[in-house]
A protein has these predicted regions:
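Alpha-helical membrane-embedded segments
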Residues: 106-128
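N-terminal signal-anchor transmembrane alpha-helix
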Residues: 1-50
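Canonical alpha-helical transmembrane segments of integral membrane proteins
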Residues: 40-51, 75-87
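Membrane-helix boundary/interface segments in integral membrane proteins
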Residues: 28, 45-72
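Cytosolic juxtamembrane helix at the C-terminal end of the final transmembrane segment
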Residues: 121-147
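Transmembrane alpha-helical segments of multi-pass membrane proteins
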Residues: 65-83, 108
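Membrane-water interface at transmembrane helix exits
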Residues: 49, 53-57, 88, 92, ...
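Interfacial non-cytosolic loop connecting adjacent transmembrane helices
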Residues: 16-32, 83-110
């Protein structure tokens, strides 16, 4: 699987030597942009989960479609967060020259992973509870639609 990701990175022209990170200022800039991208990835994942939940149709009779929505909601959250972490680990970490800076960035990458995971699940749960309570997105919690 790792060879496939490296092949994709080569195809889209991402090189390990692009923009080497050698100074503390460059590292702080990279960390700040990583935090911003983590928030953006979280927002995009919530939007994709909303779209996917609206694509799954209601079922007649004993409606169990909320289970499909819940499974996709969890899959989208895990794929978005782990994908973001793997991308940073394969693309940004090799650009950092100093080993100490690499450890500092790895810690930032781990915190951003938790930000995406916790932010995705917490914000989407709040949206389900308060804004989309009777919609398909809110049915992920197991609530039935009004009949």
């Amino acid at each position: 699987m790792l060879w496939f990701i490296q092949y994709i990175l080569r195809v889209i022209k991402i090189d390990k030597n692009m923009g080497q990170i050698a100074t503390l200022i460059q590292l702080h800039d990279l960390q700040n942009s990583t935090w911003i991208y983590a928030v953006v990835v979280c927002a995009i994942a919530i939007f994709v989960a909303y779209l996917v939940s609206n694509m799954i149709a209601w079922q007649g009779g004993n409606d169990r479609s909320y289970i499909k929505r819940r499974v996709w909601w969890v899959i989208i959250g895990l794929v978005a967060s782990i994908g973001f972490w793997v991308y940073n680990d394969l693309v940004n970490v090799p650009r950092i020259i100093n080993i100490g800076f690499r450890h500092m960035y790895s810690q930032t990458n781990l915190f951003c992973l938790f930000l995406v995971l916790i932010g995705y699940f917490l914000i989407s749960l709040l949206l389900m509870l308060f804004l989309f309570r009777k919609a398909k997105f809110g049915s992920i919690l197991g609530k039935q639609r009004n009949k």
